[in-house]
Amino acid sequence: MNAEELAIDPVAAAHRLLGATIAGRGVRAMVVEVEAYGGVPDGPWPDAAAHSYRGRNGRNDVMFGPPGRLYTYRSHGIHVCANVACGPDGTAAAVLLRAAAIEDGAELATSRRGQTVRAVALARGPGNLCAALGITMADNGIDLFDPSSPVRLRLNDTHRARSGPRVGVSQAADRPWRLWLTGRPEVSAYRRSSRAPARGASD
């Protein structure tokens, strides 16, 4: 399995990434929650909530491919968030990794997150996921399918998923582009942005 399996539309890529194994710096986890993001207005998947919506720049360059690259950014200037670039090379799209279940390296993840954090919450939420796996801004652009990368991804069998609106976005707030595995306690809670239109009034 390789990055070319993610050279597809972002929602299909999000489905493909659910259940994937992500490993970084002594911790291995299974992805249990993701969000899909598209790109520019004249692209195949216009998405006003995406960082790439207003075009390519130095910050979002990795979103434009090639697929399988890690796109990192800071949420509110604080928490590092990890995304997997998808779609054909040159087309903006990515999948945000929202939550994961720690499968190996729990002690190390706990040392990074804090001794009072419950096991199911170690990688719950995008910032916590990166903290648990030791993902930093320096990892931006790495090839997740390169065995020598500090953070690596392995696609597994597809899983049955539920879907709903994305968390905290004020644009395109009703799209069911957030996917999660049913019955997993590591999945984060849904919170609608206070700046989003009323339910049903957005795309």
Swiss-Prot record:
Enzyme Commission numbers on file: 3.2.2.-
Superkingdom per UniProt: Bacteria
InterPro entries: Formyl_transferase-like_C_sf, MPG, MPG_sf
Any one biological process term the GO annotation gives: base-excision repair
UniProt keyword list: DNA damage, DNA repair, Hydrolase
Gene Ontology molecular function terms on file: alkylbase DNA N-glycosylase activity; DNA binding
SUPFAM superfamilies documented for this protein: FMT C-terminal domain-like
Cited NCBIfam families: 3mg, PRK00802.1-3
HAMAP family: 3MGH
Recorded family membership: Belongs to the DNA glycosylase MPG family.
Protein name: Putative 3-methyladenine DNA glycosylase
Organism (species): Mycobacterium tuberculosis (strain ATCC 25177 / H37Ra)
